Design a protein with these regions (language model features):
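Cleavable N-terminal export/targeting peptides
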Residues: 1-25
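Gram-negative and organellar
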Residues: 21-395
């Protein structure tokens, strides 16, 4: 791990030069960052699952470097970013890995009535241990390509079409059955109010498959999903911005109809700016989604979150956030596992962080997070707390 710290020290030694290198309006903005982390329960295991000799707590460091691009030729805009990170653990060295994040988006305009976006993303990172409590180094590569176009046929009305394709690939054989591919198409009809708020009706169709799954009586290899959504964005005043989505989702599996599900989805979020130095964020949601549990065909997630940021001085920012969520695993698959009820889980997480900008192009962040999950399945309970310190410089 020492070589990462040495590289980080070399990069961060140019902090004082950062203001001279970066200029307002620069199209290209390179950056480098170094983060030191501690986690008390790395694998998110319950006490009953803890194995002697397994190193649950650990410190790890992350060295990141990348480039952000924001180019605006005329009425067009191209936003791109590329970053690479190296993660090294103190005790669980078998988890060491190198990740990446690539993004490219072109926001285009043609005349006064046509606009849209074309883009692609790719990321490689370690999978979460929250639901797969295996001490293995599984890396997930996610790719996404998308394109959409919108025609404003009236000062208040517009229609749009979009398409997207996504893939997710796991690096280990144990997680290969979770690999998936999906393709989607969508159509929208929108209305803009005189004050700038928008309402949109959306019809979306998704076809997906799990290419590495063998035929099974418990999980399917392919599905089709249809969504009917009503979307809204409101700017009610100079201090309040809100976003809403309510819809109905219907999922049909290729062969196992007992795993089909349908239901209501919804999310409401708002940003409130009581002053020029403070922002509050709030969200509440109800979302239905797929699960691979043998005795449940879907999971229903309901929750709320509250966060805020306070600019204490021109250099110092304080942030806090709390989230409460319930996940209920429901649906009759026809499979009964004796002694294993359907999962029902309550999660609570909270975080607090402080950000200091000693010079314009550099920040120093420190924070802590704590959380717990209580489940109807004893082995799915866990507790954790974590701490981090991060230094980043832009050039």
């Amino acid at each position: 791990m020492n070589y990462l710290a040495s590289l980080a020290g070399l990069a961060l030694s140019v902090l004082q030069a950062a203001p001279a290198l970066a200029k307002e309006g620069d199209t290209l903005r390179p950056f480098v960052a170094y983060t030191r982390n501690y986690d008390s329960n790395l694998y998110r295991l319950a006490k009953s699952e803890q194995v002697p000799g397994l190193k649950l707590s650990d410190q790890f460091e992350v060295l990141s470097a990348g480039l952000n691009v924001d180019w605006q030729p005329g009425r067009q805009r191209v936003i791109a970013s590329a970053s690479k990170n190296w993660v090294r653990f103190s005790r669980n060295t078998h988890l060491d890995y190198s990740g990446s994040d690539l993004q490219l988006k072109w926001s285009w305009r043609l005349g006064n009535h046509w606009s849209g976006q074309v883009g692609a993303t790719e990321s490689a990172t370690q999978s979460s241990f929250s639901d797969v409590s295996l001490p293995i180094n599984n890396q997930v590569t996610r790719e996404n390509q998308f394109a959409d176009a919108e025609w404003q046929f009236h000062p208040r009305w517009h229609v749009g079409l979009g398409t997207a394709r996504s893939t997710s690939t796991n690096s280990t054989l144990q997680q290969a059955p979770s690999d998936y591919e999906d393709a989607s198409v969508s159509a929208t009809l929108g209305y803009t109010t005189p004050k700038g708020s928008t309402l949109r009706g959306q019809l979306r169709r998704v076809d997906g498959e799990y290419p590495n799954r063998s035929p099974s009586l418990f999980v399917d290899q392919a599905y089709s999903q249809t969504e009917y959504n009503l979307l809204g964005d409101w700017n009610t005043s100079g201090k309040l911005v809100a976003h809403g989505r309510i819809g109905y989702v219907q999922r049909e599996n290729d062969t196992l109809s007992q795993r089909d599900f349908s239901g209501l989805n919804g999310r409401l979020s708002a940003d409130y700016f009581p002053s020029g130095k403070t922002v509050l964020n709030w969200a509440v949601y109800r979302e239905i989604g797929n699960t691979d549990d043998f005795n449940a065909s879907y999971q229903l997630s309901t929750g709320t979150s509250l966060g805020g940021a306070w600019l204490a001085t021109s250099r110092l920012t304080l942030r806090a956030n709390a989230t409460i969520e319930n996940r209920s695993f429901e649906g009759d698959t026809g499979v009964v596992v004796l002694g294993t009820p359907q999962r029902d889980e309550d999660s609570l997480t909270g975080s607090l962080s402080l950000s200091y900008a000693p010079v314009r192009m550099a920040t120093i962040d420190a924070g802590l997070q704590a959380g717990r999950r209580d489940s109807s399945i004893d082995d799915s309970d866990y507790r954790f707390h974590s701490v981090f310190v991060r230094v980043q410089a832009g050039f």
